[in-house]
Amino acid sequence: MRRGGELEREFPYGIVRQLFEPALAGADRAYRDELLSGAAAFAAPLFCGDYLVRGESRKAESAFATLHGLFWLTANLSERRPLVLAVDDLHWADRPSLRWLGYLVRRLEGLPVLVVACLRPKEAEDPLLAEVVSDPFALVLRPPPLTEAAVGVLVREALSPDADAGFCAACFAATGGNPLLVRELLAALASQGVSPTADKAATVRQIGPEGVLRSVRLRLSRLPPEAGLLASSVAILGNDVEPHAAAALAALDLQATAHAAATLARADILRPELPLAFVHPVVRAAVYNGLAPAERERGHAMAARTLAERGAAAEQVAAQLMRTSPRGDRFVAASLRDAARRALAHGAGDNAVAYLRRALEEPPPRRERADVLYELGSAERLTLGPAAADHLRQALVLMDDPVRRGWTALELGRMLFWSGGLADEAVDVLEKAIAELPPDEPDLRQRLEAALLTIAVEEPRAYPRMLQRLERLRAHPPDTSLGGRMLLAALAYHDARAGAPLSPCVARAESALAGGLLYGHEAGMGWCHVGFVLAYSDRLDAAGRVYETVLADARAHGSVFAFALASLLRGTAFYLRGSLADAEADLRLAIDACESHGFAVGLPTPFAFLADTLMERGELRTAAGVLDRVAAGDEVPKTVHLLSFRGSRGRLRIRQGRTREGLAELLELGRRYEALGGRNPAMHAWRSEAALALLELGEREEARRLAAQEIELARQWGAPRALGKALRAAGLVEGGQRGLALLHDAVEVLEDSAALLERARALTDLGAARRRANRRAEAREPLRRGLELADHCGARPLAERAHAELLATGARPRRRVLSGLDALTPSERRVALMAAEGMTNRDIAQALFVTSRTVEVHLSSAYRKLGIGSRLQLPRALAASPETRGEGERVALATPSS
């Protein structure tokens, strides 16, 4: 049983350490390595002394990496035998430990693990505590008070078998049946020599609950002075105190400390075993509150210095300093800043913010105040604190050095835009920082320019201001520093959106990727920009390699955010290819990873692509539900990332027969896209989609105009998928012989493209047009090929249409018989493919950031649908489908880098 404590609340992962350190310390080297293997290694720095094993630089990721690692440490411990995690006084637990418990209880299914926690009923309203207590599988026990009869039994056991009934009733009335108060009341009565007779009932009432505290102090006052000094030291230091630390604070030698500890144990004040701890928090409170306020504060200040001199963890020192008043002490501010850095390295952002706020109150030396404000604002950004921007603004005002101002502006600008939606201010901040930078800071300058360009292409009010800078940026090619690579990637993405010729954009993107700097944690959106350019230029294999590299890095560092973002973008690439099952699996994985790890995706984009994928698979109702999760009905989400969402909702409305509404969404998408400099139809083919909607509404001339514009823009860009899609739409709008020629051109353009679904559409539309033109024999071949490709992609509505068109030509195509493989959900298919490659359930779970139980459920379902009994049969069962040959997720299992 481990226990929370008032002082320990300031110590990140205090409960976690209490729970796991004994098991790890008692394990031999081989078993310890086994316990901390795989994803559990992400938790190792908590127990290895060096808080910065993986560096401070991955602060945003470290919280989730630590939670993920602790979950797998728990799973590893439970492999040999069932595991019980018991915590008393959970309401006093530190917040990182509470966050971990909430994370754990949602993933316990299938693990032989029992979590038992005790807390005060009224404390359960705290959101983190409520997350644990209100879990659907939690069994909440609320023990009633002891009955009067039960109190009588305890009185007779403690004082005398002949205790008077009236005396026992008085004990019950004085304590209300609270077990702790009964225990302490009886100890107080025994220490005062009160006999349990009827005439002493009034004495019981006089002592009462408050008398319990007085009793502890009375017992303490009767002990030697050394015992009082040691009790005060342990009360100051908190529970589980090492004798050396308590002795140093009490100014006692070790022998005197041992004697005093034994004396306190006999007096039922301290526990008899080491480390030193009170028998109950109420006893500690009695000792602690018996000290004068000035004495308590002086004790905490001395304890902090004593712990620091003894090499204690920075957080232990900080826990003491948090109980002191500001005095302008440099040691205090420096110690709190150090503790904040270490807390951030493990994702304990709440604690880091508290430390830095207290450091600011100290206050630090004037020349360091700007640094503390910067550190505080950065920490608050990670915890979504509302004061983050204000603290970064204050830091910026106090800084004289233009380089420091530049780094602060970079942090503030990104935060204003991504968290606050304040693009105008973000642009002002970044532009001013760039103007102030000296010429010998090219790396920082290019990082600032890259951030500025990234913001501008997403915000209509900021974009016109950015246009004035673009020519100058192009005139001075970025260098090979990280900032240069980031700027090169941002320029490539901007020009690709603008519809510039494909070749120079791809060249820029590939140059930005050279050397691998963009895969680093500081590269921001750099690798995303490169991936987008490659994917929308139809270099889907190259884009896939970018995403695979990021996924491997995300697994190696436990970065759920990078894992989710790379899964989103890889899912997008799968969608563009037409691999709809893979696209759905990745997109759902991205969304689930974000939601289950405590942060929202924040963008409608993954929901939009998932809805598009579901529509192509014929699941309109599910697609509508996905979009409603972003904005129900006709609402518009309050985010800058509206374009993909608008397009997806427009396509859904058209498929639902609400063509006019769908057209309005597409036209609004086009208006917004152009306001952001967007002209490339590879990213948003709104013109061709609007043209087909206009055709359906009988507005052929406007449809022709939009279709012709898209052909021109697609030719300018030069990627087959975009041009093929534009030609197909124009062919449908034109009709007749010219329409047939355009559809034939679309098929030819797409013939060697990786965009299989778009090729299937073009083939089906060409065949259908030939059938309508009474050229049935010529219609059959494109329709057969369209049907085969649509089946391969999993595009059921398109396959059904191609099948119906083939029947109309007089052909007799065989209906596709759905095999067990076709019945697998995308998630089941993904897990089955990984298992077929030899990965264990644990390997798969760690790679996908899910639990082993989730993998077991997916595999069991897959076995049933495939008609097999074990994973040994998976390779043969999956190889039976051409759809899976050469595919699947090639996952190189990664462990935390050292």
What are these regions (language model features)?
Residues R2-R9, L119-R120, P143-P144:
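A short hydrophobic beta-strand->loop->alpha-helix junction that borders the nucleotide-binding pocket
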Residues Y13-V84, A130-V133, G152-V153, G193-V194, ...:
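Conserved Walker-type P-loop NTP-binding/catalytic site
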Residues Q18, P143, A150-A354, R358-E361, ...:
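Short secondary-structure boundary elements
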Residues W100-R142:
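Sensor-1/coupling segment of RecA-like P-loop NTPase cores
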Residues Q255-A256, G349, V353, R357, ...:
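Internal alpha-solenoid helical repeat scaffolds
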Residues H259-T263, R271, P275-F278, A294-A387, ...:
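Extended alpha-helical scaffolding segments used for macromolecular assembly and cargo binding
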Residues R310-G311, P326, H346-G347, E362-R366, ...:
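Short coil/turn linkers that connect adjacent helices within long alpha-helical scaffolds
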Residues D765, L807, P813-S898:
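Helix-turn-helix DNA-binding segment
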